[in-house]
């Protein structure tokens, strides 16, 4: 298992290591969404108070750093997941050809790759926060990433603890980093966390929803090996369960948008998500395992669209669009 495939050159090894991080797939890019959304929302709020307080270039720079930080940390987490799960992955049809499960990458190579990604992500966080509260934010996230693969073990299903919980927390938590990138020099960490609670809750519920749908693709193999996952709760009522889960993120979005109270975000975020998620549930077919993968992809597109929507809101606040509209209406 731990012997690398013979005659694999440096370029082949690099590609295999990138595969352990999932950088060649879209999934890791989910992890930057909470941080980037929070960066833009915090920036828009600050511009709403004083349009000259920040430049758009500064906000984009901080959002870019958050993107790189989250991606590197996710890459390290994915490599760690494959290290821990390599024996399980080798027995699952969808995962048996992963580099560690198939023996194409050694444990030493994977550990070095994981460590390099982790410390680069720490360096990015240092740049984002200007040296403040780095390990205060990094350690809880590190702990959740290390714990995640173990929550797939059947013992946790007995206490109704599922890996989707930790995944949701890990993907939502970087919202604090994003907000702190804008206001970290002005607000104490406790206040920043309070601002980010609605975003963290949204991403937590959202992640539990789309990851439960995605995990349903492996339900046949997972049941054979008694793998723990949230869809176990649903049994044969998986569609109804997903419908319930899909409502939870929709209930949290208004708490985020109301802080800015932007008509643009009510339409581009709240309305768009509502229509999309209703369509996802309507089109889901529990007899076609691949339909869970479709929900996962559709929500990735929703996340990307929300980044665009928040970027537009930053621009609208910078030019005082809503103040001008309000003044025009009063005339």
From Swiss-Prot:
Its cofactor is Mg(2+). GO terms for biological process: mycophenolic acid biosynthetic process; terpenoid biosynthetic process. Its main location: Golgi. This is Polyprenyl transferase mpaA'. It is found in: Golgi apparatus membrane. It catalyses: 5,7-dihydroxy-4-methylphthalide + (2E,6E)-farnesyl diphosphate = 4-farnesyl-3,5-dihydroxy-6-methylphthalide + diphosphate. Pathway: Secondary metabolite biosynthesis; terpenoid biosynthesis. One of its GO terms (molecular function) is polyketide synthase activity. It holds the Pfam family UbiA. The keyword Membrane applies. It comes from Penicillium brevicompactum. It comes from the Eukaryota. Keywords: Golgi apparatus, Magnesium, Membrane, Transferase, Transmembrane, Transmembrane helix. Belongs to the UbiA prenyltransferase family. The gene is mpaA'. Polyprenyl transferase; part of the gene cluster that mediates the biosynthesis of mycophenolic acid (MPA), the first isolated antibiotic natural product in the world obtained from a culture of Penicillium brevicompactum in 1893. MpaA' is a Golgi apparatus-associated enzyme that catalyzes the prenylation of 5,7-dihydroxy-4,6-dimethylphthalide (DHMP) to yield farnesyl-DHMP (FDHMP). The first step of the pathway is the synthesis of 5-methylorsellinic acid (5MOA) by the cytosolic polyketide synthase mpaC. It is a multi-pass membrane protein.
């Amino acid at each position: 298992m731990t012997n690398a495939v013979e005659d694999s050159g440096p370029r082949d090894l690099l590609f295999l290591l990138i595969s352990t991080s999932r950088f060649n797939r879209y999934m890791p890019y989910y992890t930057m969404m909470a941080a980037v959304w929070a960066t833009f929302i915090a920036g828009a709020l600050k511009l709403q108070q004083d349009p000259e307080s920040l430049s758009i270039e500064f906000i984009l720079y901080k959002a870019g750093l958050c993107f790189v930080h989250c991606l590197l940390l996710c890459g390290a987490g994915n490599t760690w997941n494959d290290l821990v799960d390599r024996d399980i992955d080798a027995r699952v049809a969808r995962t048996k050809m992963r580099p560690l499960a198939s023996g194409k990458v050694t444990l030493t190579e994977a550990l070095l790759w994981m460590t390099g990604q982790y410390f680069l992500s720490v360096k990015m966080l240092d740049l984002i926060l200007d040296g403040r509260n780095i390990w205060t934010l990094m350690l809880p996230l590190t702990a959740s990433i290390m714990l995640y693969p173990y929550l797939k073990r059947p013992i946790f299903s007995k206490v109704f603890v599922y890996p989707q919980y930790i995944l949701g927390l890990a993907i939502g938590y970087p919202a604090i980093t994003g907000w702190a990138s804008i206001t970290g020099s002005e607000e104490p960490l406790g206040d920043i966390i309070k601002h980010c609670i609605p975003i963290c809750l949204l991403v937590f519920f959202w992640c539990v929803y789309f990851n439960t749908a995605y995990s349903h693709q492996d339900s046949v193999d997972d049941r054979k090996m008694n793998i723990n996952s949230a869809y176990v709760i649903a049994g044969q009522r998986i569609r109804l369960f997903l419908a319930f889960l899909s409502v939870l993120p929709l209930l949290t979005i208004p708490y985020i948008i109301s802080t800015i109270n932007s008509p643009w975000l009510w339409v581009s975020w709240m309305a768009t998500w509502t229509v999309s998620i209703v369509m996802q549930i309507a089109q889901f077919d529990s007899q076609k395992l691949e339909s869970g993968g479709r929900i996962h992809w559709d929500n990735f597109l929703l996340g990307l669209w929300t980044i665009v929507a928040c970027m537009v809101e930053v621009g609208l606040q910078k030019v005082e669009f809503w103040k001008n509209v309000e003044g025009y209406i009063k005339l």
